[in-house]
């Protein structure tokens, strides 16, 4: 009988197979649930991926049997150290790789979280380690059934998916253009997205109504990290997780990881968000942006200068475009894209004014008009790609491009145009981005620079030996330098300057004012995840009608997007040419939403988004979020798309009670509403009667 080694406390008990070194049991001590439901699916504790120096091929190396396990105690912490001295080359009869590893697992006496590190020792002249998948778990689900399990996945601003064992195997996920499920030769379904960009944060969470599982990377070096999820599907139900680090370990070298965290809880995903935030608060700082930006609730997005050879507006039209946005919607912030040579998504990164749109003088004069009429301008710059048809592709594009392990460039296609991905950790490209952004602020009077794709598209490892990065996984550090130095430089030109990026990245948020957040309804998008974890970060949400939808579907989607932006306190992203296509009823709803957003802004400025915390019960069919207000008081925002009449909102009763409750809504109604004290078990609650006839979005202030 193989001996098991254990590590645990009152929260959990972890068991390690003494021969194979894999997790054999993982028990929640409060619920008694052993998360490991499929022993046959249980995998190794780690996997290595190495380059065969002779063939140049990438091979998978699996740990062979354990050579030693040490148990330790130091103060209030216990530990296990599991040592392996070699690795088996998967799928071959090759001699074992002389690559050893030691896994350390450490836990405090009264903490649901354990910390995991791995040390890799490469003594094999045949192989160079380039990827480390660790920690790695397989064979899990929670409770008696997997069908009520929920996964929280940090794809862009977040996903929340019920029953991923099933959903991740459907055509919906198999057919995604990014972050898609793939099926391996072994029949295993998997998703893997890299941090920081496609994955906005470095943690995942899995829970049901009694159990929780948290996996996070506490990597202060911010290496490119693949957040991997696996499942056997409904016919072989289990889930798996892993964190992949891209790092080179050559023969004779040793590499030790930063900690990863594994926690066994009885809580939902909010616990994971708070725990991750507690860690990262010691690593990053919150942004310090100009005060006037707190009053910006909407921006005028102008992608309508030149696209695919078609001219829609010229630089001389900027004053009238600005005036129209200001008059119709109160827009002061003019976001200018498609201004560069050949227009949107062409000839990047040639960020020079397109000659057919006008002269640099006309562009500068247009910006001056905006600035002199109480507005300000943000310019679009793509921070990622180089058009292969550019005149400079052979001389600069190929040199700056990222290279994979075979020396090939990473190619991406947008519309009819092909690009290569540039290496943000190569100093030449960094300097070009920094200087182009600075030039737009100095020469054209812009206050904002928007770096497209920076927090949205996937990071990759770069193997180009001629680049200035010290290792293959330094993608994120490159963009951090760009953001930090560009912000400092443009603030030196104009202290009111700021940066924006596409989508979200926790480490990038320290340097930006707004993240243009989008994902896709089919992705189980859940923007509340990023907003709750980082309530200080401003999200800019797309609030335009969808071109691919018509009729009722188009109307419902616009209502949903506007309502979500109101609940999250996001800045509205609206294009005048798109708003002009709205029917009268939808146009009226857009304007009503803008009015409500402006009325809510003083509350958002002194509030903190806490998602549904403190909400005990809500009427069916309604979505409710909670903002805690500085100085006392609570704001509850309710989206009621079906216009369900009445109902009761039950909330935790704040200390000191409630003096009174008022409401206002998207239709312009407002007034006092009734509430009464009640209880749920031992807890006191406030039962707030929702007014009949209220609008689709209802705001409740409890003082």
Predicted segments, located by residue:
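Active-site-adjacent "subsite" loops/lids of carbohydrate-active enzymes
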Residues: 309-315, 361-363, 367-368, 376-444, ...
């Amino acid at each position: 009988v193989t001996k098991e080694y254990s590590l645990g406390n009152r929260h959990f008990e972890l068991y390690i197979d003494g021969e194979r070194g894999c997790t054999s049991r993982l028990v929640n001590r409060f619920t008694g649930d052993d998360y490991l439901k499929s022993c046959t699916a249980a995998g190794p504790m780690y996997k290595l991926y190495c380059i065969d120096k002779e063939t140049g091929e990438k091979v998978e190396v699996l740990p062979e049997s354990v050579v030693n396990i040490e148990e330790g105690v130091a103060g209030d912490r216990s530990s296990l150290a599991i040592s392996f001295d070699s690795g088996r080359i998967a799928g071959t009869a090759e001699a074992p790789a002389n690559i050893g590893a030691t896994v350390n697992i450490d836990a405090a006496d009264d903490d649901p979280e354990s910390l995991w590190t791995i040390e890799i020792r490469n003594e094999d002249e045949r192989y160079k380690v380039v990827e480390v998948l660790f920690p790695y778990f397989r064979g899990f689900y929670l409770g008696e059934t997997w069908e009520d399990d929920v996964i929280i996945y940090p794809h862009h601003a977040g996903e929340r998916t019920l029953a991923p064992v099933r959903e991740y195997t459907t055509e919906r996920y198999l057919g995604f253009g990014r972050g898609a499920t793939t099926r391996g030769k072994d029949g295993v379904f998997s998703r893997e997205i890299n941090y920081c960009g496609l994955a906005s944060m470095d943690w995942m969470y899995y829970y049901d109504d009694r159990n929780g599982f948290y996996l996070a990377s506490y990597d202060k070096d911010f290496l490119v990290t693949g957040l991997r999820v696996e499942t056997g599907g409904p016919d072989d139900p289990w889930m798996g997780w892993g964190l992949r680090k891209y790092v080179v370990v050559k023969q004779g070298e040793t590499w030790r990881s930063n900690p990863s965290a594994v926690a066994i809880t009885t809580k939902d995903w909010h616990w994971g968000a708070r725990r991750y935030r507690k860690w990262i608060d010691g690593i990053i700082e919150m942004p310090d942006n100009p005060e006037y930006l707190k009053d910006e609730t909407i921006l005028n997005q102008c992608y309508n200068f030149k696209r695919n050879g078609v001219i829609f507006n010229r630089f001389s039209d900027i004053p009238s475009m600005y005036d129209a946005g200001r008059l119709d919607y109160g827009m002061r912030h003019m976001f200018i894209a498609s201004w560069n040579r050949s227009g949107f998504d062409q000839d990047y990164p040639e960020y020079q004014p397109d000659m057919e749109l006008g002269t640099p003088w006309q562009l500068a004069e247009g910006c001056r008009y905006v600035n002199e009429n109480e507005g300000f301008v943000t310019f679009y710059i793509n921070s990622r790609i180089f058009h292969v048809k550019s005149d400079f592709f052979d001389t600069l594009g190929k040199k700056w491009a990222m290279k994979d392990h075979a020396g090939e460039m990473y190619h991406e296609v947008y519309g009819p145009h092909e690009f290569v991905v540039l290496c943000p950790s190569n100093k030449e490209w960094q300097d070009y981005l920094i200087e182009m952004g600075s030039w737009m602020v100095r020469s054209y009077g812009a206050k904002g620079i928007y770096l497209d794709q920076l927090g949205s598209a996937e990071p990759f490892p770069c193997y180009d030996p001629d680049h200035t990065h010290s290792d293959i996984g330094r993608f994120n550090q490159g963009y951090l330098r760009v953001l930090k130095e560009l912000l400092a430089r443009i603030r030196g030109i104009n202290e009111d300057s700021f940066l924006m990026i596409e989508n979200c990245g926790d480490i990038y948020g320290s340097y930006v004012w707004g993240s243009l957040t989008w994902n896709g309804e089919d992705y189980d998008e859940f923007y509340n995840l990023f907003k709750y974890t980082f309530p200080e970060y401003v999200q800019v949400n797309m609030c335009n009608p969808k071109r691919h939808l018509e009729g009722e579907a188009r109307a419902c989607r616009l209502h949903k997007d506007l309502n979500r932006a109101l609940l999250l306190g996001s800045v509205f992203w609206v294009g005048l040419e798109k708003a002009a296509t709205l029917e009268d009823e939808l146009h009226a709803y857009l304007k009503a939403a803008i009015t409500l957003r402006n009325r809510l802004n003083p509350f958002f400025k002194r509030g903190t988004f806490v998602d549904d915390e403190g909400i005990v019960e809500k009427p069916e069919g309604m979505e409710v979020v909670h903002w805690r207000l500085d100085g006392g008081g609570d704001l509850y925002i309710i989206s009621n798309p079906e216009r369900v009449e009445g109902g009761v909102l039950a909330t935790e009763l704040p200390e000191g009670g409630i003096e009174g409750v008022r409401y206002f809504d998207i239709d312009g109604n407002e007034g006092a509403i009734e509430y009464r004290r009640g209880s749920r078990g031992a807890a006191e609650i406030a039962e707030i009667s929702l007014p009949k006839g209220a609008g689709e979005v209802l705001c409740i202030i409890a003082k």
